Amino acid sequence: GYVNKENQNVDSGYYMAIEGKKAVESYTYTNPFFSLDHPMVRVGTPLHEPNVWPSEDKHPGFRSFCERYFWNLFDLSSQLLKGFSLALGKDESFFDSYFHKSDTLSSMRLIRYPLLKNYPPVRVAPDGTKLGFGDHLDVSLITVLFQTPVPNLQVEIDNEWYDVPTSDSDFLINCGTYMSYITNNYFHSPNHRVKHVNAERLSLPFFVSVGYDTVIHPFTPAGTEIINTKHDDNPPIVHGKFLEEGFDALVVKNGLT
């Protein structure tokens, strides 16, 4: 990602459209606390990058809005995780000890899919569906998605693809691979994809993640062993390493947005 030639970030920044090749453009930003003097940034910890913002003169208020929206979504996610905690048979504060503003690796992505007369070539799935983004699992704890009301998402259930209803008055909540991992697949991370729709639309996913050094020991919720096909706990893994491996696999499979 980049805003200009000086941006050396791996993730944060602007991913531009490329005429004749790529129509989608996006802007990614992460924890606003990740400044150059943040201890994890200072020592070069992977996935810790200061955000690169467009000029305030050219885009007045953009940065302040984005940072405010990030923390609003963080607070919403904190409340959602209380519900997940209770559903897992834990105290509602279970995730509070892992999900902190100071070190969260959560990221926000602003994605624009444009309406074009001459759209660049798009990928086609084996079933003939034209794709805006191929099938994948979200590399996150959970994902909180806002999108404009243009139907495009599909979820895979029993080898069949189903359209996901869309609305600009609701958030769509999805379980990511880390939630699946720490609950031994009790909360399944669904495979999903984005259909190609030649229409102007926006997609704003907030990928919820805990800190890099965080380790949540996997567990099977009490009383669920009968319906859960996985009986052995996954081995503990440092969250940052889990994310790095997941992101690398996602880029290899589908490329960058």
Predicted regions, residues:
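Peripheral, non-catalytic segments flanking oxidoreductase cores
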Residues: 1-257
